[in-house]
Design a protein with these regions (language model features):
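Conserved alpha-helical substructure of the radical SAM core
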Residues: 1-103, 114-122
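Radical SAM enzyme [4Fe-4S]-AdoMet core and its adjacent flexible, acidic
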Residues: 30, 75-78, 97-178
Length: 178
């Protein structure tokens, strides 16, 4: 049985990250009709499913995001979204109004991957944190992600300092892995 399915609701992105392979496909948004017809096709594979609205593209840029979230709720699907975080302030109310929203993962390294100016970095991080704080009070999981190596990681120290400011105290050592 499946536990999750990835649905690419758009392959359009508002950024051009240096670490993203991108796509040569025509840029488009999935229609509400296509999304609506896809959800019941997943039913035979599971009784409970997390729907991840991300493959390529920035899901928060979808002009009908609220409708897609409503359709997922009607089909009792929990929604997980991965975002670059730049549109969170604009979509906060839509996201937090969705009872089906389970998790939002924010790729904090996206800002640096777009030659993000250091003077705008604090504004970006503050907006992400404001969303994360509100979402957490509603029981939504928020994961703040950073590249460890091989990507846009030169600003990780500054981002970690920001996070330590927001979450003071001892932090466990990062997990290693292969």
């Amino acid at each position: 049985m499946l536990k999750k399915a990835y649905i690419e609701i758009t392959n359009r992105c508002n950024l051009h990250c240096t670490f993203c392979p991108g796509t040569r496909r025509e840029k488009q948004f999935m229609t509400v009709e296509a999304f609506s017809s896809l959800l019941p096709k997943l039913r035979p594979w599971t009784d409970y499913l997390y729907v991840y609205l991300h493959v390529m593209g920035e899901p928060l840029s979808h002009p009908q995001l609220a409708e897609l979230l409503s359709l997922a709720a009607a089909r009792e699907r929990k929604v997980c979204i991965t975002t670059n975080g730049t549109l969170l302030a604009r979509q906060t109310e839509t996201l937090l109004a969705a009872p089906t929203l389970h998790k939002v993962s924010v790729s904090l390294h996206s800002f640096e991957g777009n030659d993000g100016a250091q003077e705008r970095e604090r504004e970006y991080l503050d907006a992400v944190w404001a969303f994360a704080d509100r979402a957490a009070t509603r029981g939504v999981i928020v994961a703040l992600r950073l590249w460890n190596e091989g990507g846009a990681e030169t600003r990780n120290g500054a981002i970690e300092a920001f996070l330590h400011e927001k979450c003071p105290g001892e932090w466990p050592e990062p997990r290693g892995g292969s």
